[in-house]
Amino acid sequence: MAKDILFSEEARRAMLRGVDALADAVKVTIGPKGRNVVLERKFGSPLITNDGVTIAKEIELEDHFENMGAKLVAEVASKTNEIAGDGTTTATVLAQAMIREGLKNVTAGANPMVIRKGIEKAVRRAVEELHAIAKPIEGKEAIAQVAAISAADEEVGQLIAEAMERVGQDGVITIEESRGFTTELDVVEGMQFDRGYASPYMITDSDKMEAVLENPYILITDKKISNIQEILPVLEQVVQQNKPLLIIAEDVEGEALATLVVNKLRGTFNAVAVKAPGFGDRRKAMLEDISIVTGAELITEELGLDLKETQITQLGRASKVVVSKDNTTIVEGNGHSDSITARVGAIRSQIEETTSDFDREKLQERLAKLAGGVAVVKVGAATETELKERKLRIEDALNATRAAVEEGIVAGGGTAFIHVTKAVESILAVTTGDEATGVNIVLRALEAPLRQIAENAGQEGSVIVERLKHEAQGMGYNAATDEYVDMIETGIVDPAKVTRSALQNAASVSAMFLTTEAVIADKPEPAGAPAMPDMGGMGGMGGMM
């Protein structure tokens, strides 16, 4: 396919049009008075959102060169979303400001490679200062503030703060769509895995269709049990203790399952069989996790252990086990706290080492089941459109909260960027020429988020930026109430990780943009060109066309 090539100024101008098209659509959403953007969907109702990355991903421009510019800035948003989970609009606003400011200087004859050096130096200094002014997040109230600012909803803030308090930092919080109108929090205490009873005859509560075992013994094996003789010796020991038994095995079938069911119906003893969770190597790891939580020994031939010789001392214990059709929940397992701590440490190391997102997610789930718990935020709304928009906002709020716990918080509303300008200005004393121009580009761009928040609130951005430069550190502009307040005191805060990631990613793409000297794209198809040439009929058939 033929290609079109644009060089230097012409290339950068074409790409800038794409940058502006995308950034202008995204930046209307920033701040407490930011507006929404409506996205067309091929099927179903349109999506209404104020999530920067969702809007950026939707934009596809007709002109190939403009589209490349738009895609570069979309990359800033998606990278920030990947690292911090929020701050995508801020990153887009910063990128646009750096690109526009930088382009003026490159057009005027500045050396883009030296400008790039200045941009990188300024961003490094800004990030150091952000780390220095970040405050660790403490208490449920502070967590609620971060989530409420991100979602622009105090109720959501309280919900996420409660979820994090209940399941801990290592717990898993998932967001699901609910069929009702209200948004609720559902917390699963104890360790839960997605396998239910082997037979419905094992249930003890017919109303809830659950098998509830109080103070049961727990047998864990990676073998398939089809003959009752294999577990008879340990079964007799458990019956003597007059306690129920939970069997977690690769499978329980045939005569073994029939015997367990018959004895349950007769009232001789109460045993519930459950298939082992997971598959392959992950199954073995999950069985080991359950063994550690319950204080059981995993009966496996790899360790030379035989089911027939299992003793009651090798079984685990828990205060309660609830088995439904699809899930098994073990509450207050009898595992030793030192063993659990060691296992948690081992899983954390694996999370750091893995390069696969899927593996990381599964390891995170295992960590949550061992160390914390699982909380489910069930999002409700009146219409499907509102439900999707609300779900996106809650996901952003959850990501922002996690980021805040990791690296602390800074003043929100674009204020932190204004506060780091003094530190960035200090390097101008030792920087000259085009490198100093690069530093000045970053200084100007750092004002852009606050300027845009003010403009979305109907104020003059430049006036507010100038005033804040002369205010004490921590003072900022509350666009929701049109007042100047102490941002952290008022609870208007941003996670330091989100602020840092937005700045670093914006600078990275802007520097690449400014150093672009040629752009190559596919030549558009001529209008009205035939899709396929006329075949003129097939040989010997007199021309079918």
Swiss-Prot record:
Record key words, sorted: ATP-binding, Chaperone, Cytoplasm, Isomerase, Nucleotide-binding
Q: Which E.C. number(s) belong to this protein?
A: 5.6.1.7
InterPro entries xref list: Chaperonin_Cpn60_CS, Cpn60/GroEL, Cpn60/GroEL/TCP-1, GroEL-like_apical_dom_sf, GROEL-like_equatorial_sf, TCP-1-like_intermed_sf
Q: Where does ATP bind?
A: T29, I30, G31, P32, D86, G87, T88, T89, T90, G413, N478, A479, A480, D494
Swiss-Prot/TrEMBL catalytic activity = ATP + H2O + a folded polypeptide = ADP + phosphate + an unfolded polypeptide
Q: Name one GO biological process term.
A: protein refolding
**The UniProt record lists the keyword Isomerase:** yes
Tell me where on the tree of life, at the top rank, the source sits: Bacteria
Q: Where in the cell is it found?
A: Cytoplasm
One Pfam entry for this protein is Cpn60_TCP1
**Could you tell me which PROSITE patterns the record lists for this protein?**
CHAPERONINS_CPN60
According to the UniProt entry, its GO molecular function terms are: ATP binding; ATP-dependent protein folding chaperone; isomerase activity; unfolded protein binding
Main location (coarse class) = cytoplasm
What family does the entry list?
Belongs to the chaperonin (HSP60) family.
Q: Which NCBIfam families match?
A: GroEL (TIGR02348), PRK00013.1 (NF000592), PRK12849.1 (NF009487), PRK12850.1 (NF009488), PRK12851.1 (NF009489)
Biological role: Together with its co-chaperonin GroES, plays an essential role in assisting protein folding. The GroEL-GroES system forms a nano-cage that allows encapsulation of the non-native substrate proteins and provides a physical environment optimized to promote and accelerate protein folding.
**Subunit-structure text:** Forms a cylinder of 14 subunits composed of two heptameric rings stacked back-to-back. Interacts with the co-chaperonin GroES.
What is the name listed in the Swiss-Prot or TrEMBL entry for this protein?
A: Chaperonin GroEL
Taxonomic source organism: Exiguobacterium sibiricum (strain DSM 17290 / CCUG 55495 / CIP 109462 / JCM 13490 / 255-15)
